[in-house]
């Protein structure tokens, strides 16, 4: 809880975004007219990747915090992602449009398909709009008009690439940080020289065994700076 205001917390995962959507709120008797809202969207999360949805077999993942949220909130058992890929799902979630209506049915594109293209793909993808229109009505714009301070931390990807126009501030967000954190390549592989206990490691593990996470740090900054006003945070992990 960031402040005395009640906080509504929505949790989802791409590929099965709407599979887990627990809602956590304070006592309804003390619920303000404009509760704080935190929407957490994780990338490439399957419904069996969180322990609280383990039905028949032991889960290989340990997700204690998500499990705790699910016990206090609501779990949806028959809810599905608007699309199995990144940009189409994100656009649909933010705008409320089906990917086909939003002309976002593929991950990359931005132009008409090319016939007889010499690639390894045998299928010609449909035309794909390169970006979500700036004048699109988004969740952030609606909340902004209703007195919310809106913030985004993490992945955006609602256009050809992560940094293409329009950006979050063009779609209704007062504040945005899309820092990934790790910037250098990991050699010889992604498991070496990263988040170690070495003194000079920029991403040294903390006392709980976790590396520094830029998305989380930025999200906490937004929450602390806006704790005394109604806020909406869209927290999308890379």
Predicted regions and their residues:
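Solvent-exposed loop/turn segments at secondary-structure junctions
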Residues: 44-47, 75, 82-87, 99-101, ...
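Signal peptide processing junction and immediate N-terminal pro/mature segment
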Residues: 18-27
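Active-site-proximal N-terminal segment of extracellular/periplasmic enzymes that hydrolyze or transfer
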Residues: 27-74
């Amino acid at each position: 809880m960031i402040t005395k205001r009640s906080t509504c917390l929505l949790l989802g995962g791409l590929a099965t975004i709407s599979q887990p959507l627990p809602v956590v709120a304070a006592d309804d008797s003390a619920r303000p007219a404009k509760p704080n809202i935190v929407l957490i969207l994780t990338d490439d999360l399957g419904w069996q990747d969180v322990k609280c949805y383990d039905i028949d077999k032991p889960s290989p993942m340990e997700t204690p915090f998500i499990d705790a949220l699910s016990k206090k909130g609501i779990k949806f058992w028959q809810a599905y992602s608007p699309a199995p890929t990144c940009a189409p799902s994100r656009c649909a979630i933010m705008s409320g449009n089906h990917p086909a209506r939003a002309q976002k049915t593929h991950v990359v594109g931005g132009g008409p398909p090319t016939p007889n293209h010499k690639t390894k793909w045998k299928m010609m993808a449909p035309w794909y709009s390169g970006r979500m229109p700036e004048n699109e009505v988004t969740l952030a714009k609606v909340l902004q008009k209703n007195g919310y301070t809106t913030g985004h931390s993490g992945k955006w990807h609602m256009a050809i690439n992560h940094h293409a126009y329009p950006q979050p501030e063009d779609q209704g967000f007062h504040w945005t940080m899309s820092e990934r954190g790790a910037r250098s390549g990991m050699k010889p592989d992604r498991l070496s020289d990263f988040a170690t206990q070495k003194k000079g490691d920029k991403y040294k593990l903390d006392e709980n065994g976790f590396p520094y996470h830029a998305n989380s740090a930025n999200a906490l900054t937004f929450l602390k700076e806006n704790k005394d006003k109604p806020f909406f945070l869209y927290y999308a992990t890379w």
